[in-house]
A protein has these predicted regions:
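Charge-rich, low-complexity amphipathic helices
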Residues: 43, 57-61, 65, 108, ...
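Conserved AAA+ ATPase small/helical "lid" subdomain
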Residues: 58-61, 65-139
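C-terminal engagement/docking regions of AAA+ P-loop ATPases
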Residues: 128-186
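Canonical AAA+ ATPase core
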Residues: 1-72, 126
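Helix N-cap and loop-to-helix transition residues
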Residues: 16, 36, 52-53, 79, ...
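A broadly tuned preference for mixed-charge, low-complexity surface segments
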Residues: 25-41, 45, 72-95, 99-109, ...
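Generic alpha-helix detector with strongest preference for long hydrophobic helices that associate
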Residues: 5, 16, 20, 24, ...
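Residue-level signal for functionally critical sites in structured catalytic/ligand-binding pockets
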Residues: 29-32, 36-42, 110-114, 121, ...
Length: 186
């Protein structure tokens, strides 16, 4: 690698065995500039696809958000019924299809498992430090509002449509609470 600010031998940096660089990116986040073909030839790419199994993703979000909450001084994790709502919502919005098989408008935002962990963590911190209580549906809606709509304001409309057309029909208590908390979307 040439470093134009340095003169002589100091201006050239050569690779050595053992040197590694690891970078991550979401496949849907292309950024401003595409990588050049020359740069792509010098790199190895590994694609990690979304977790196909609900239970595996659920357990991962539960474990990782629990660790983060503990580190944040929150003595309890997110209740399983709220985690089920969160993970199901992320999966359905990510795939563009409900668990019942109904097609949804696709989101422009990447809704990764890491983002679900972040929402669970922020919901846990919010609920504990604002109310001293366990996470409820309002906390999940607040977290989703930021995560699902951060890149495109149109995604807020898609989230509202999901709540009105899909969540409204579900009869489990956690889903009813999630639907009733929809007015917390900004």
């Amino acid at each position: 690698m040439a470093i134009p600010e340095l003169a002589g031998e100091e201006g050239m940096l050569f690779a050595r065995p053992g040197f590694n660089l690891i970078a991550t990116a979401n496949t849907r986040d292309r950024g401003v500039n595409e990588m050049s073909a020359a740069l792509k030839r010098r790199l190895n790419f590994e694609s990690v696809f979304p977790i196909p199994d609900f239970e595996t993703e659920f357990q991962l979000v539960k474990r990782e958000s629990g660790k983060l909450l503990k580190e944040s001084g929150v003595p309890q994790g997110v209740p399983e019924d709220m985690l089920e709502v969160l993970v199901t919502t992320f999966r359905e919005l990510r795939t563009g299809q409900t668990r019942e098989g109904v097609a949804l408008s696709p989101f422009s935002t990447v809704l990764s498992t890491a983002e679900a962990v972040s929402v669970a963590h922020s919901a846990g911190v919010r609920s504990w430090f604002l109310r001293g209580e366990a996470v409820n549906a309002e906390d999940i809606v607040h977290g989703l509002d930021g995560a699902a709509t951060k890149d495109d304001p149109e995604d807020r409309k898609r989230l509202r449509a999901y709540l009105e057309q899909t969540v409204k029909k579900r009869r489990e208590a956690s889903w009813t609470a999630f639907y009733e908390a929809r007015h917390h979307l900004s």
